A protein has these predicted regions:
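Juxtacatalytic substrate-recognition/specificity segment
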Residues: 20-143, 150-151, 161-164
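Short acidic-hydrophobic surface loop/beta-edge motif
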Residues: 13-19
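Beta/coil-rich, acidic/histidine-enriched accessory regions frequently appended to metallopeptidases
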Residues: 216-333
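Single conserved hydrophobic/aromatic residue that forms the stacking wall/gate
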Residues: 1-11
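Solvent-exposed loop and beta-edge segments used for protein-protein assembly and interaction
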Residues: 18, 186-188, 297-299
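Acidic/His/Gly-enriched intrinsically disordered linker/tail segments
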Residues: 97-98, 114-119, 134-205, 210-249
């Protein structure tokens, strides 16, 4: 580890660089100059070190001081975080910690070619999540898919254009809105509930979830406990959050989300007496939602809806139907 107060004791060689908060190592195969390394199997292995250093520091400042994934007295104040660049064509990038002491990153050149370094923002998010445990401030549920969802949210905070830059996540999410919250199919696609929570409780609240998360809980249980919410109140909040996802009514990213507003569809099967039934393949799971587009009526028209929730219906997945419940309403856009 590199103690910033005793820099003369750090490992020094020609394949190392450092910033105020990071020390960067690269493998021997690169040679001494990351801007002009030997090719590997005909592929360029160049790394824009100045841009990497700049973005690392920018993300670090935001994750530490704005999102508060570290607090004063953290080991971050004593040690630089570590970045290891592997001379490899593998597409792997990994954020975590080194020896349970300080946040660290392991990356390859093909993951740091975009100028914005979205991959670095995501993986450094994992490093800061791990830092909470390194600092002895919490156990963060012992790990779960919520970590990926959070890293996407952290990336979205430092890059408001994330939905466009990684549009494949949006393309997937809009077909998976019915999935249960925290479903593994959506952990990379859907940081949107965290956006709602951050607005509702303040940005540092997400890091506090990690500090307070206990083994045996999941993030929903922790959230309810921290906010003294019963099941009914939590369901009301989730309904409100999902309504915001229709027109993306978030001030921070209002401009950036306009191309994705009001873009959902929902497969409905005609039923008897004029009813329409949500198809089994997109029927909502726990905290999932359907957004059903409606024709806009003439001004001054009254709009009514009849809704019937059916639990345990044949042909649909049914788990604990006795606990089923629904929220429904209109979203005017």
């Amino acid at each position: 580890l590199c103690d910033r107060r005793q820099r003369q004791t750090c490992i020094r060689d020609s394949r190392m660089a450092y910033t105020e908060n990071f020390i960067i190592f690269w493998e021997k195969g690169f040679g001494n100059d990351l801007s002009n390394p030997p090719q590997l199997e005909g592929h360029s292995m160049k790394v824009n070190l100045p841009n990497l250093k700049e973005k690392l520091e920018s993300f670090y400042t935001y994750f530490y001081h704005t999102l508060q994934f570290a607090k004063q007295g953290s080991k971050c104040d004593k040690y630089r975080m570590m970045v290891m660049i592997n001379y490899s064509l593998e597409g792997t990038a990994y954020g975590g910690d080194y020896d349970g002491q300080i946040g660290a990153l392991w990356i390859t050149p093909n993951r740091v070619q975009d100028e914005k370094l979205n991959c670095i923002a995501h993986e450094l998010g994992h490093s800061f999540q791990s830092q909470i445990t390194c600092d002895g401030q919490g156990e963060a549920w012992g790990g779960c898919g919520f970590f990926e969802m959070t890293s996407q949210w952290m990336l979205w905070q430092v890059n408001p254009d994330w939905m466009t830059d990684e549009k494949y996540h949006w393309d997937a999410f809009k077909t998976l809105t019915h999935k249960a919250y925290l479903h593994l199919d959506n952990i990379y696609h859907s940081p949107y509930v965290l956006e709602y929570w951050g607005i509702r409780h303040g940005l540092p609240f997400i890091a506090e979830l990690y500090r307070q998360g206990k083994r045996g809980e999941d993030p929903v249980i922790t959230y309810k406990r921290l906010n003294s919410l019963g099941q009914k109140e939590f369901c009301n909040e989730m309904f409100d959050a999902c309504r915001h996802f229709v027109n993306w009514d978030f001030k921070r990213v209002w401009k950036e989300t306009r191309p994705y507003a009001n873009q959902y569809t929902c497969k409905m099967n005609p039923s008897k007496e004029g009813w329409y039934q949500v198809a089994p393949e997109n029927c909502p799971e726990n905290y999932g939602f359907n957004a059903v587009p409606l024709s806009v009526p003439q001004p001054g028209s009254a709009v009514e809806v009849e809704f019937l929730g059916e639990a345990g219906r044949e042909g649909y997945n049914s788990v604990h139907p006795e606990k089923a419940g629904w929220r429904y309403g209109f979203v005017a856009v």
